[in-house]
Amino acid sequence: MRQFKWIEWNLEKIDAHGLSADEVEAAFNRVFHIEERKDGSFQMFAQTPSGRRVWVIWRHDRVDDEIPDAFGDLIEAPVFVITAY
């Protein structure tokens, strides 16, 4: 299951564009287009449950102290949304 990491900073950014964390998270289930950017983040064009089409800029959260799991049981790094509009 996809996990998201939200902090006050990115919540304020999406709120300024009239979006909630729930809407942005749900948009990950309705993706029209996604591409990797030069900085390693992703730019995604998607749709919220209400039908609003949005751009979401995100990356996998950086976890420096994670030890590789020889059995492959590590959960994918959480999604850190940089902004959505």
What are these regions (language model features)?
Residues 1-85:
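Ribonuclease/tRNase effector modules and their secretory precursors
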